[in-house]
């Protein structure tokens, strides 16, 4: 952040802020960011907290680089900054296919994920005694990779780290579980909602939709393989527009069509895209494709829907009645999202986070 940015934060008391730390070890952090001039992060944090700016922090964990004793040091030093630093999210690195001539970074596997979850749990128990709060949290993706059951929602405290993918999935699942679907969703004409998502969330979304009672409506969950960044990138927030177009076109011949015929009645296909797939401007995808271009290419109505469960459910109810109508743009960018951003291809070919906040540190 520039001096001008900081002065604006202090003057407007823009708190809390979300910042990417990755490690508190100065030399290692400079290497990770490929920025030999990067100021020690603990100095940056001290300056912020001295001005009464509360911080939520994130570590993108890269096996073999900033884990082990480096991670232990980072967790403890960030906890020492509590309550100025209110929480810490640990997120697994995602490796893009754009990694020619870059340092080797190991892929996160199930065994590694389970070990990380166990480590975080140990730290949480310690911090509950010393700070009265869990403080450190493992992102949902660790549980997906490790095939580990999510902890109860109350284990996530005030859910301060939703933006970093901590508690998003458990919250989505619990909201669906508690929603009353006794009244079925009804459509005047047979309607097929095609819902696109990344591979991480696909099975969860499919299970959730089984709870929804429908009349004249069916759901199809279409898993989008990320060809743009590489198939190891599984989160919905990094899916691109062209990958959506190609996936729908490839599957249309045997599953989808513009007008689905059921007996003598023609139906309608409608594509639903979670807003988390749009870039920070909310106008296009990370590859520059716009929702309008997707609609033109596929010749079907396209709707951008909320990523949170309650907003998604309410939008489904509206679309069930009028699937051809255009929804109002409901996206409002939070001015407090002036964070250093989720790490995007910082020279290590690393991306992370459920959302597309693409402000890489340099």
Language-model regions, residue ranges each:
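Auxiliary Fe-S-binding modules of radical SAM enzymes
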Residues: 80-81, 89, 94-362
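Conserved Radical SAM active-site core
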Residues: 1-84, 95-123
